[in-house]
Amino acid sequence: NDCEITIDTIEAHYWNYKIDPKKLDKSWGDSIYTDFSDFNECSLKMCVEIFNQDKADKLTRSLSDCDCIRFSDGFWYKFTKKNVTKENAIMKITEVCGFSTDSIIAFGDDYADIGMLELCGTGVAMGNAIDEVKERADIVIGSNDEDGIAGFIENEIL
């Protein structure tokens, strides 16, 4: 095993790398260590750390029914079913509920958020967002550590 992998299912978060379970982010829910040799769960997303760009490109090509987004911090790549995006989910919700995306405020900080920020009426980038997100947002607020969303809601909505 020469790469770190995480897979999220509806029930749990699976991972194959050596880390003290007490140090895992609790927001991941139930984290289960596995070597993935007999993994047979329906996954929502798979993240893989790949340090070699050629190998990352090869994996992306072999998973042609998936979209791939590289995370901004490091060499992690996220694979999800093709066209399963935040913006597509928002469009479905607005269709079912009967309101416009113009009435939605979206918050984001990384590549996977850009489409959502551009789609919604107000796109808000976190202060800790990557530059590409800040450039596409309507507003840039404080970072996650500065409670940027709470401040925005208190000052702009309430």
Task: List each model region and its residues.
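Conserved acidic, metal-coordinating active-site core of Asp-based
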Residues: D2-F107, Y111-I114
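Mg2+-dependent phosphoryl-transfer enzymes with acidic/Ser/Thr/Gly-rich catalytic loops
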Residues: K78-L158
